[in-house]
From Swiss-Prot:
Domain of life, source organism: Bacteria
Region (Disordered): 1-61
UniProt name for this protein: UPF0337 protein lmo2158
Sequence similarity: Belongs to the UPF0337 (CsbD) family.
Amino acid sequence: MSEDKGMKDKAKGLKDKVVGDAKDKFGKATDDKGKQVEGKAQKAKGEVEDKTGDAKKKLSE
């Protein structure tokens, strides 16, 4: 199996968690509830991608 099994998902997950966190913090600082919700959703998406990457890696072992 490919060495990068799950690594792409983990990388996308990390990016989404970081960007989502930034959007959430920006939304809090500017009192923009929409941006906060968008950031929280993107962080959650990142968590799912990270877990998916872990599962793919585990299955490829």
